[in-house]
Amino acid sequence: MAAKIVVGALVAIGVAVLAGAVWLWPSHQKVDIPLPFQNAAGGAVTTEAGHVLSSKTAPCGSPSNGAVLTAEPEQAPPGGGQCVQTLISIDSGPNKDANTMLEFSGGPGQPHLAVGDHIRISRQIDAGGATSYAFYDFERTWPLIAFAAVFAVVIVAVARWRGLRALIGIVVAFVVLVVFLLPALRDGASAIPVALAASAAILYAVIYLAHGVSLRTSAALLGTLAALLLAALLSWGAIELAHLTGLSEDQNNEVAAYLGNVSITGLLLAGFIIGSLGVLNDVTVTQASTVFELAETGAGRKAIFVGAMRVGRDHIASTVYTLVLAYAGSALPLLLLFSVANRSLGDVLTSESVAIEIARSAVGGIALALSVPMTTAIAAVLATPLLSSHSPNRR
């Protein structure tokens, strides 16, 4: 009976998630490119591959800065400051195999390029049809591919087919975020239903793909969904009660300036909810597995619950400080600035930038802690009747 109730609840929630996704499905209409991301013609910035040929110190202000070179770079007029002039080979695009020269002042925030470095350079065409180049970013494609490949190989080597299914689940999660969540938020949809629908869809895919379809995983999924709803309510309460606006972050200010129909507090709320997914999933799956393993010993439901909660408390203790330290690590530059600002500890902790991280940690920690008894109770109810049907001598 308990199994039928849990399966029925998961089916009903799944149908509700599907209906919500259809109702909230984004328009995917093309939007204007924000000004900072436009090229001179109003389109997207075009980048090309390049690599550094040489670098030298020379007077700033060369007329050849950024131009496609047909000869040696022109020298700057005398009397200016000193810059680093870097000769770049253009490796893609209409000027492939040509060279350009880029100047850098060498101050804070300026890139430090060495001979052989592979970079991305933006290509601009002015009203007169002349092409110019500027430094855009370092080329990171192959290092990232290498790390991703090693990550995938290690996961599959250790976890085998379950690891492969987990990797597929990660791909599904990113597809949901890119195809549904981000466009829906960009359309101005309400953050809570969008984030809940996206998160629930990710959980169904990730848990069942990685761990298979069983009563054990169904218990973990139902516990995670319950904790996720709790996290959404806590996130809303934290943002409202603490008057968090999200405008202390530069990216949110850019969103407010260039995507006026997007709610910044809604975006903050969605971030809180999505951020709680991973840690909740980890804890609930572990708890459900613990309960079903304890049930194999023939213990009673109460003993199983108590034993699993001992394991769960250890998991909570280790995961909570991991959660807090992860958020503290992401805010480390901000904390460093506050450390030299000669402000009181109370002012620092209640400033919006730090308060957001505190609220995020608190929401995740509360949802994490409460997910343990919820999942343990659900799994204990499911595991003990299942065991008794195979163990007629069990009391």
Identify the meaning behind each predicted range.
Residues 135-151:
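N-terminal membrane-entry
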Residues 220-228, 257-274, 318, 322, ...:
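Pore-lining and gate-forming transmembrane alpha-helices of multi-pass membrane transport proteins
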Residues 277, 282-285, 291-342, 346:
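Helical hairpin unit composed of two closely spaced alpha helices linked by a short loop
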Residues 105-140:
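Extended, hydrophilic extramembrane loops/domains of integral membrane proteins
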Residues 149-156, 161-254, 262-275:
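Transmembrane alpha-helical segments that form the functional core of multipass membrane systems
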Residues 328, 332-395:
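Hydrophobic alpha-helical transmembrane segments of membrane transport and translocation systems
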Residues 1-45:
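Hydrophobic secretory-pathway targeting helix
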Residues 43-82, 119:
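Structural detector for short beta-strands of small beta-barrel domains
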